[in-house]
UniProtKB/Swiss-Prot annotation:
Organism, scientific name: Pyrobaculum neutrophilum (strain DSM 2338 / JCM 9278 / NBRC 100436 / V24Sta) (Thermoproteus neutrophilus)
HAMAP family documented for this protein: Ribosomal_uL30_A (MF_01371_A)
Subunit structure: Part of the 50S ribosomal subunit.
Swiss-Prot/TrEMBL keywords: Ribonucleoprotein, Ribosomal protein
CC annotations in GO: cytosolic large ribosomal subunit
Name of the featured protein: Large ribosomal subunit protein uL30
SUPFAM superfamilies assigned to the protein according to its UniProt record, in alphabetical order: Ribosomal protein L30p/L7e
Protein family according to the UniProt entry: Belongs to the universal ribosomal protein uL30 family.
Length: 175
């Protein structure tokens, strides 16, 4: 039996706006579902997704998201199709007990994606493999306390690029 490869889960946040974005970078951001400033997606860090992240490096910041932060994002910023809030009742309808259970299952690699575009049939007594009708992005506020620099990378004192587990602090400031 072939073992399943579990890739890390990354939160990707777009920090720079639209007007001067080159066409190829805009297409990459569109594939990542980052169409506006201060939107976040949660992706599986497979090699092809990491290639897209590296290409859009100067417009985004990213890092490993933990289960507690993801549960808080789902609770406070999760939206369903039709711009309705994600509720505990919706999760329970699809076999999930709590926001924390979904977040832990995603971060641990039990499920490969958070959102399904349409209804997925759940087997009797089992939970759905994702959250049906959940929008694949989260709209966040600008960070409390502001940003350092949108021209420098995180490693040299700015805000762009890879920031590792410190992305969780930024997300909490943006909720």
């Amino acid at each position: 039996m072939i073992a399943k490869v579990v890739y890390p889960r990354y939160a990707v946040i777009r920090l720079r706006g639209i007007p001067t974005t080159p066409r190829d970078i805009a297409a990459t951001l569109d594939l990542l579902r980052l169409r506006r400033k201060f939107t976040m997606t949660v992706v599986v860090g497979s090699p092809d997704v990491l290639g897209m992240i590296e290409k859009a490096n100067d417009w985004i910041t990213w890092g490993e998201i933990d289960a507690n932060t993801l549960a808080e994002v789902l609770k406070r910023r999760g939206r369903l199709v039709g711009d309705r809030p994600l509720t505990l009742e919706h999760l329970q309808r699809w076999g999930w007990r709590s926001f924390e259970e979904v977040a832990l299952a995603f971060v641990a690699g039990e499920i490969d994606r958070l959102s399904c575009g349409r209804k997925v049939p759940a087997r009797e007594g089992q939970r759905a493999p994702c959250i049906p009708y959940l929008k694949p992005f989260f709209r966040l506020h600008p960070p409390r306390g502001g940003l350092n620099s949108l021209k420098l990378h995180f490693s040299v004192g700015g805000d762009l690029g890879y920031r590792g587990p410190l992305i969780n602090d930024l997300i909490r400031r943006m909720l």
